[in-house]
C-alpha cells in the first residue's frame, strides 16, 4: 500500500517521500503522464507506473503486503496473491537510491505541464 511504499522510500533514500517525490517531474505523483521522463529519478517513477499497469486484479494503492529488511536489502514476502505490488514498490525505492545523483530540485513540484501524450512503457 501507499504507506508501505513511503516507508520503503524513506529508509532507502533517507528523504521524506511526499515532498521530494510526490510531485516530481512528469511521472512522480498521482497520474503521471507525458513525454520522456525528465531524468533518472523521474524514470524511476515512470517504470513504477508501468509496473503497476502490468498488474491485474490487485488494488494497487491500498493492498497491504509483507516485506522485511535483510541487512540493507528490501525483501518482499511471497504469501499474498498481489505480492507483485511489493516488487514494483521495492524496485522503485531502490531506483530512487541509485539515482540520487540525478535528483534536480527544478523538477520538484514541477509546474510546467507535461505533454498529454503517454510515453510508451
UniProtKB/Swiss-Prot annotation:
Cysteine disulfide partners in this protein: 26-114, 28-45, 44-95, 50-121, 51-88, 58-82, 76-86
One Gene Ontology CC term in the entry: extracellular region
Free-text comment on the cofactor: Binds 1 Ca(2+) ion.
Coiled coil: none
GO molecular function: calcium ion binding; calcium-dependent phospholipase A2 activity; phospholipid binding; toxin activity
Tissue specificity note: Expressed by the venom gland.
Tagged with keyword Secreted: yes
GO terms classed as biological process: arachidonate secretion; lipid catabolic process; negative regulation of T cell proliferation; phospholipid metabolic process
E.C. designation(s): 3.1.1.4
Active site: 48, 89
Temperature dependence: Optimum temperature is 35-45 degrees Celsius.
Main location: secreted
InterPro entries membership: PLipase_A2 (IPR001211), PLipase_A2_Asp_AS (IPR033112), PLipase_A2_dom (IPR016090), PLipase_A2_dom_sf (IPR036444), PLipase_A2_His_AS (IPR033113)
Domain of life: Eukaryota
Description of activity control: Inhibited by magnesium, cadmium and manganese ions. Also inhibited by crotapotin.
Species annotation: Bothrops moojeni
pH curve summary: Optimum pH is 8.0.
Localization terms from the record: Secreted
Catalytic reactions of this protein: a 1,2-diacyl-sn-glycero-3-phosphocholine + H2O = a 1-acyl-sn-glycero-3-phosphocholine + a fatty acid + H(+)
Keyword set, alphabetical order: Calcium, Disulfide bond, Hydrolase, Lipid degradation, Lipid metabolism, Metal-binding, Myotoxin, Neurotoxin, Secreted, Toxin
Family: Belongs to the phospholipase A2 family. Group II subfamily. D49 sub-subfamily.
Name of the protein in question: Basic phospholipase A2 BmTX-I
Cited function: Snake venom phospholipase A2 (PLA2) that shows enzymatic activity in the presence of a synthetic substrate. In vitro, blocks the neuromuscular transmission in young chick biventer cervicis preparations. In mice, induces myonecrosis and a systemic interleukin-6 response upon intramuscular injection. Also induces edema and exerts a strong pro-inflammatory effect. PLA2 catalyzes the calcium-dependent hydrolysis of the 2-acyl groups in 3-sn-phosphoglycerides.
Cofactor: Ca(2+)
Chain residues that bind Ca(2+): 27, 29, 31, 49
Amino acid at each position: 500500500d501507499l504507506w508501505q511504499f513511503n516507508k520503503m522510500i524513506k529508509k532507502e533514500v533517507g528523504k521524506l517521500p511526499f515532498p521530494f517525490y510526490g510531485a516530481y517531474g512528469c511521472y512522480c505523483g498521482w497520474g503521471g503522464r507525458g513525454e520522456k521522463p525528465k531524468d533518472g529519478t523521474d524514470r524511476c517513477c515512470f517504470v513504477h507506473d508501468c509496473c503497476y499497469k502490468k498488474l491485474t486484479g490487485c488494488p494497487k494503492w491500498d493492498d497491504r503486503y509483507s516485506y522485511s529488511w535483510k541487512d540493507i536489502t528490501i525483501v518482499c514476502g511471497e504469501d499474498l496473491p498481489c505480492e507483485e505490488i511489493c516488487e514494483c514498490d521495492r524496485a522503485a525505492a531502490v531506483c530512487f537510491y541509485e539515482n540520487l545523483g540525478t535528483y534536480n530540485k527544478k523538477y520538484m513540484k514541477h509546474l510546467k505541464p507535461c505533454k498529454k501524450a503517454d510515453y510508451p512503457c
